[in-house]
Amino acid sequence: MIVGLDHVQVAAPAGCEEDARAFYGVLLGLEEIEKPALLASRGGAWFRVDDQQLHVGVADGFGPATKAHPAFRVSSAASLEMLAARLEAHGYAVSRPSQEEIPGTLRLHSSDPWGNRIELVADVPYGT
């Protein structure tokens, strides 16, 4: 039986490693983890997200995922707004869906350096 989620992979073009580290590591604050030796030559980068992982993998014929996306849970509404400000300060567009769509949840959408959609989510009391 399934007991959890191990990792999510997003695709990126060849040569993506430094941009992956700058975006997912520095900007979003994820911890980079070492790829297994047999996989390191394929490029990309891996990051820890609590007890799960985000894998940025090199894809031949890359095209961004504009609908499918990872959704990262953040600790608070204040953290969500801080990350929104950081994304915007670095030139990334941020959109904020209506809280009415999922009551009790604040969300924002943005894109990584290659146009893959990402979502950031914070739980809040309904109506705030």
Where are these regions (language model features)?
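A short linear hydrophobic-aromatic micro-motif
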Residues: 32-34, 55-56, 92-97
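Short acidic/glycine-enriched loop/turn segments that link adjacent beta-strands
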Residues: 39-43, 64, 101-106
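Short, conserved charged micro-motifs
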Residues: 16-19, 78-83
